[in-house]
């Protein structure tokens, strides 16, 4: 490495360290970022709502106990799409000035006198609107006994509390909430806390709930409807899983998971769950994802309910992980809340990290450590491109708040915590975390609070190390070479920023590197541009870096070590095989390694024995799927399909189509993945088998086993002729649950026939499908390269209608056009996306467009570089694989 390059790295390190000292202070309410002034602080909130699931409007009354810290002329708080009917401060009438752009009300005394410091009672009467797109207070329709009925539910994170009640809608404002709901008799009402009393009032019933602990407004939850419930206890806490009528038994798996998780988290934190009950609510139709509201966690049905007759291992794994993530939030996020949205990674990264730990603890048969690299692939790919950002990326604009709810926050943030845990040790990590929770409970926190307690527990300068990961974008490529000297192994390490975009500012990380040498695993801190290690002995197998694949960095081995690892590939530990395959493909994507080297590793897969085959196939699928997009409509497309089939078809032959008694969950996952991949790569035998299984199920001769049901339906959808397409369409329109809605929607959207694809696009505008499914059909159609232009044009033409159905949750409308653009592989498409997105979605659409544009540009680069020269390598790969049969 040149002296100049070393100087650049040194300067980068000094800059990051200086920024860390300035940018990671401990929590202070007065200096916490936000749009509202800190001169008026809410201390208690009595909220009364009149709600009817069949109505599209509601009324509310809010009584806020305020502390005015200094004399002010007016009070400013958040309100959006609310109509004020009356406003008083004590007995003083207030004029309400509405600002829908900034989503605020300014309340000014009509007597012209200032508001003095001290305690005040603010009274507000208002009207609001019930939504239909899964944010704020929304209706969730579902079929029951041949009719459509509705429940009401809430999703207030990040900035939707203000659409349900006037509020100080920022995380730093923690307030006690006391909720009263007036609803028609016959409906049950749920909220964060237990019901304290209820009284009938004519056709209505008034429900009073116990006051909450101090918490931010976005955690308030209410639901009104008819519910079936499963109940249990764990750690002395009453637990329930609630769902729409008729789906009670589908909550059994989630309830069993909850009974395991709550005591586990109590023990891990040394702090018991803080509320007197915990409910999990499955919300049909318009709900997306899940929300950790304290005491009343809500989920999309498919994220919580498990039907044993139709659900395999992968579905159970996803549900367990989502439940674990949301329950972890009861500590990370609820008990201790991020100080502002720019610190939201403290909530989400910790929940991701702890959910993974808990899932592996209770389900070792799933071999989750082998999946860790695959789970990081999306974040690594994003962070290597031009459209990335730092985990802590500065002030967050409210109209773009969901830009930070992404894989950088969740997956990269979780990986950073894993690396820190390895570096300071699990005991120090857990002790520091317990001290952090004790110190900040019922309050807010910043990264500085966390690093302080980790440092105190471990004696390390955790803040300086962590800042190189949280306060700058990107991640390192660690270059390694080794040789034997005098009975020792001399390991030379170097680091530089890894990029697939061809240009990035120089950066330096302090990397907790895990290495495996002669069977011993150790962690070292690479905190310089280059570093030399002397390790005992000269084993035959080269020193492995990041052997578990959970470190957020890539590794490039020197030619001699790379050749040695490739030769010994089948004998490497399973996680190291996955990681080496992952890094080899990423380096080939970036043009730093011949793609033929990656193909050579693929040919070694059939030799691999033992655990981890499903993780290896999933990792191979990631690379092959990318190449299928990059090489679409090029001369290399056909040989790629042949090579993929030659690799994967023998694997499916080995495991067979039908599950066997006593087979492992890994075998089940492997079979499903192979069916889907081989159908995607047009393997004729697999397609014929899938269609035969589907036809037998449709005719009532042989129901599809749960273990292959999803895979067979997806494969059938891709290759369905017109009659089978009609059968799948009928199943979609009469689906009784979200799992099947999404399954049939995906299957139909993947169909190869352009005429049938156009029919799927038309479905997105039909009212029969709920708003959490319909607007995403064009994006799923666009995943097929041959249909991408059709799907893109459809979204652009019908953007207003689709945007209304998609709504604002998770920045949904800003993703409509980018979601239909993933499979393009030419620069003209990237330029068109930028222009059309600006025209349709404006500034809030910039980040989604940038992310997908970066993906298109990478696919274009690989197409230009590889489409001609890869043909012979792919043909040779297929011949070699077939010769081993």
Q: What spans do the regions from the language model cover?
A:
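Beta-strand-rich binding/interaction modules
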Residues: 84-89, 462-463, 473-546
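Long, ordered, helix-rich scaffold segments
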Residues: 376-378, 384, 503-506, 516-525, ...
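Hydrophobic alpha-helical and helix-loop surface patches within well-folded domains
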Residues: 2-3, 151, 209, 238-496, ...
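Bacterial N-terminal signal peptides
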Residues: 8-17
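N-terminal, polar/Ser/Thr-rich
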Residues: 21-59, 145-151, 171, 463
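A surface-exposed beta-strand-loop module
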Residues: 79-144, 201-202, 530-538
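Surface-exposed beta-strand/loop patches in extracellular or lumenal glycoproteins
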Residues: 63-81, 177-184, 494, 498-513
């Amino acid at each position: 490495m040149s002296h100049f390059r070393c100087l650049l790295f040194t300067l980068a390190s000094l800059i990051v360290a200086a920024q860390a000292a300035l940018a990671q202070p401990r929590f202070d309410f007065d200096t916490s970022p936000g749009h509202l002034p800190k001169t008026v602080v809410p201390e208690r909130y009595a909220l009364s709502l009149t709600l009817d699931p069949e109505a599209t409007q509601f009324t509310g009354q809010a009584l806020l106990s305020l502390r005015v810290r200094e004399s002010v002329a007016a009070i400013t708080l958040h309100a959006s799409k609310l109509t004020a009917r009356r406003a008083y401060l004590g007995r003083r009438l207030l004029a309400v000035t509405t600002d829908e752009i900034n989503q605020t009300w300014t309340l000014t005394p009509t007597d012209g006198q200032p508001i003095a410091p001290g305690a005040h009672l603010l009274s507000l009467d208002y009207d609001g609107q019930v939504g239909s797109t899964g944010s704020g207070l929304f209706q969730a329709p579902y079929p029951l006994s041949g009719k459509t009925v509705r429940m009401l539910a809430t999703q207030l994170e990040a900035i939707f509390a203000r659409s349900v009640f006037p509020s100080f809608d920022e995380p730093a404002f923690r307030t006690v909430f006391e909720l009263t709901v007036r609803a028609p008799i016959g409906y049950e009402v749920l909220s964060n806390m237990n019901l304290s009393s209820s009284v009938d009032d004519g056709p209505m019933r008034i429900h009073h709930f116990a006051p909450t602990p101090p918490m931010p407004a976005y955690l308030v939850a209410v639901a009104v409807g008819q519910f079936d419930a499963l109940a249990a206890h764990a750690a002395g806490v009453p637990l329930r899983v609630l769902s729409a009528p008729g789906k009670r038994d589908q909550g059994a798996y989630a309830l069993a998971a909850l009974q395991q998780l709550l005591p586990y988290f109590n023990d891990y934190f040394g702090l018991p769950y803080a509320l007197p009950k915990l409910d999990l609510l499955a919300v049909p139709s318009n709900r997306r994802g899940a929300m950790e509201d304290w005491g009343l966690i809500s989920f999309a049905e498919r994220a919580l309910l498990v039907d044993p007759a139709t659900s395999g291992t992968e579905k159970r794994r996803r549900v367990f992980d989502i439940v674990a993530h949301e329950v972890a939030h009861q500590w990370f996020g609820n008990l201790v809340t991020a100080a502002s949205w720019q610190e939201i990674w403290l909530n989400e990264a910790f929940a991701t990290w702890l959910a993974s730990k808990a899932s592996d603890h209770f389900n070792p048969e799933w071999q989750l450590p082998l999946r860790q690299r695959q789970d990081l692939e999306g974040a690594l790919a994003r962070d290597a491109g031009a459209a990335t950002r730092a985990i802590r990326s500065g002030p967050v604009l409210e109209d773009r708040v969901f830009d930070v709810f992404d894989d950088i926050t969740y997956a990269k943030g979780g990986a950073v915590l894993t690396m820190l845990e390895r570096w300071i040790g699990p005991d120090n990590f857990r002790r520091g975390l317990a001290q952090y929770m004790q110190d900040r409970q019922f309050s807010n926190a910043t990264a500085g609070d966390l690093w302080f307690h980790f440092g105190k527990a471990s004696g390390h300068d955790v803040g300086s190390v962590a800042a190189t990961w949280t306060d700058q974008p990107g991640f390192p490529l660690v270059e390694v070479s080794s040789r034997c000297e005098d009975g020792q192994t001399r390991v030379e390490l170097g680091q530089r920023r890894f990029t697939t975009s061809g240009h990035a500012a120089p950066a330096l990380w302090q990397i907790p590197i895990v290495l495996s040498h002669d069977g011993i695993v150790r962690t070292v801190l690479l905190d310089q541009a280059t570093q030399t290690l002397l390790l005992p002995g000269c084993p035959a197998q080269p020193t492995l870096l990041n052997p578990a694949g959970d470190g957020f960095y890539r590794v490039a081995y020197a030619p001699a070590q790379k050749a040695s690892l490739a030769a010994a590939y089948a004998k490497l530990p399973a996680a190291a095989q996955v990681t080496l395959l992952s890094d080899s493909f990423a380096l080939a994507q970036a043009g730093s390694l011949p793609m033929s080297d990656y193909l050579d590793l693929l040919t070694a897969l059939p030799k691999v024995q033992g655990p981890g085959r499903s993780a290896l196939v999933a990792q191979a699928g990631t690379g092959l799927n990318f190449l299928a997009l990059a090489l679409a409509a090029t001369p290399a497309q056909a040989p790629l399909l042949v090579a993929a089939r030659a690799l994967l078809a023998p694997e499916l032959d080995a495991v067979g189509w039908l599950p066997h008694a006593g087979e492992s969950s890994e075998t089940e996952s492997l079979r499903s993945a192979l069916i889907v991949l081989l159908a995607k790569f047009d393997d004729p035998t697999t397609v014929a088998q899938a269609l035969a299984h589907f036809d037998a199920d449709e005719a009532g001769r042989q129901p599809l086993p749960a273990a292959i049901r999803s895979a067979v339906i997806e494969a059938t959808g891709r290759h369905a002729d017109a009659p089978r397409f009609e059968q799948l369409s009928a199943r979609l329109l009469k689906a009784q649950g979200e799992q099947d809605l999404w399954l049939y929607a995906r299957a139909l959207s993947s169909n190869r026939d352009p005429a049938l694809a156009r029919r799927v696009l038309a479905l997105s505008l039909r009212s029969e499908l709920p708003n959490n499914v319909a607007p995403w059909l064009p994006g799923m159609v666009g995943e097929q390269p041959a249909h991408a232009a059709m799907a893109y044009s459809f979204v652009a033409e019908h953007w207003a209608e689709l945007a209304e159905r998609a709504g604002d949750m998770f920045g949904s409308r800003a993703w409509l056009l980018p979601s239909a653009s993933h499979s393009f592989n030419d620069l003209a498409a990237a330029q068109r996306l930028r222009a059309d997105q600006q025209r349709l979605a404006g500034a809030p659409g910039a980040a989604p467009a940038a992310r997908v544009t970066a993906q298109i540009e990478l696919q274009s680069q690989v197409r230009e570089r590889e489409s001609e020269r890869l043909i012979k390598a792919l043909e040779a790969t297929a011949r070699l694989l077939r010769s081993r049969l």
